[in-house]
């Protein structure tokens, strides 16, 4: 609540969404300070930088529905790693199938080692194209925890940073929506996402 009142959630987002319209530099300085105080909370708080990807590649309707929630304190995660896809994200197999009946995408599969896996909003890398086995078959999806369909099957036993849960997630017909265009999930969106994440991780490391 204190961070929200200070305007430090979604601080790089435009003011019309509840942000401060700050550049990335003040955000990284804040990430350093927060990590120095509490590394676990720093992990949870800093994953708000996922909203940068949604802001850059999502549509206007997604902006209006999701960005204010992050500015008001809701949490985010990026769901990339799987049991058989870690550093090689081209091997991601979590399946995304469009349901004409439901009018949305349904996600099925397992994600592993997901930092802040119990977050409110998730950016999920999933395989949307039949027959494609490499990165060109992957798209980015937005999953809202309020929709249900995802269970936290395991919380990892780590040596430190226990305040930030690292989870194994099971997706079972979880309703989601496409972020941006199909097939650009890895080659464009994850690359942009990770560029911002590296700055945040570097700032946390300095703080620690």
Predicted regions and their residues:
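Flexible, glycine/threonine-enriched loop-and-boundary segments that flank and lead into catalytic domains
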Residues: 1-13, 79-101, 106-112, 116-121
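Internal helix-loop-helix
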Residues: 2-72, 114-117, 201
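A short, Trp-centered hydrophobic/proline-enriched beta-strand micro-motif
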Residues: 72-80
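Short Gly/Pro-enriched turn/cap motifs at secondary-structure boundaries
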Residues: 84-87, 113-116, 132, 158-165
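Short beta-strand elements
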Residues: 91-98, 125-126, 169, 173
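A short core secondary-structure module
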Residues: 104-150
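A glycine-rich, basic-preceded beta-loop-alpha segment at the flavin cofactor/substrate interface
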Residues: 146-149, 153, 165-197
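Extended amphipathic alpha-helical segments enriched in small hydrophobics
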Residues: 198-208
């Amino acid at each position: 609540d204190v961070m929200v009142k200070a305007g430090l959630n979604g601080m790089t987002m435009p003011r019309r969404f509840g942000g401060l319209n700050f550049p990335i530099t003040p955000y990284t300085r804040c990430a350093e300070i927060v990590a120095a105080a509490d590394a676990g909370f720093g992990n949870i708080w800093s994953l708000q930088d996922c909203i940068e990807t949604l802001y850059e590649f999502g549509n206007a309707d997604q902006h209006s529905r999701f960005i204010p929630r992050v500015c008001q304190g809701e949490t985010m995660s990026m769901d990339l790693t799987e049991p058989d896809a870690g550093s090689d994200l081209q091997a991601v197999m979590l399946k995304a199938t469009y349901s004409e009946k439901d009018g949305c995408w349904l996600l099925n599969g397992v994600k592993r080692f997901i930092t802040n896996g119990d977050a409110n909003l998730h950016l999920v890398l999933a395989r949307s194209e039949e027959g494609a086995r490499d990165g060109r078959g992957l798209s980015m999806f937005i999953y809202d925890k309020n929709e249900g369909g995802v269970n936290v099957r395991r919380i990892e036993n780590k040596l430190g940073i226990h305040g930030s849960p690292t989870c194994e997630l099971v997706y079972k017909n979880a309703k989601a929506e496409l972020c941006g265009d199909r097939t650009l999930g890895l080659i464009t969106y994850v690359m942009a996402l990770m560029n911002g994440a590296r700055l945040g991780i570097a700032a946390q490391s300095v703080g620690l």
